[in-house]
Amino acid sequence: MEPDVNRDQIPLRDGTRLEVRPIRPDDADALVALHARLSADSIYRRYFGVRPHLAPADVDRFTRVDGRTRFALVAMRGTDLVAVARYEGRAGHSSAEIAVVVDDTLQHQGVGRSLLERLVDVAREAGLDTLAADVLAGNAAMLALLRTLDLPQRTESDGDTVTVLVDLSGTALPAARRERARRHLARARSVAPP
């Protein structure tokens, strides 16, 4: 069966495909389930501390995006949410913070990279010019993932945390990637609260 060209998918090594789409409010339960499946180490690397449960206010904020200052892409395996890449900025600013989390069973298979590349494209299309990632200094996998973006970067460190600033103001996106980013933004904005 040929993949639908209007659907965004990430192929896995075993031949299955993950559907990529913007997060929606009705993903709340699936997001909580993903968090429950994460190892303590994955949670620590994502949130910089112990966080056994997501607070309802966080779930609400994480699943309600506006396609402008707040946006998130999810990777779905059937009805299971298996990865999230998000940015969150402030109104009137051209920068945003990013975060990525991938189900432990799918780490190191290119899912995080594929989602992050798409998130960067969406951020550029949304008019952002800088993305910032705060990463624990010992999180070599995330630091390596950010280096794969092939965009100008600057790093700052306070010893425990490395902040990677990614410059998005460079070259224009290829047409196919720009169109994919526009589709994701349009889908997110169509379900955004007024």
Language model: regions and residue ranges:
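Long, contiguous binding/interaction regions
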Residues: 1-194
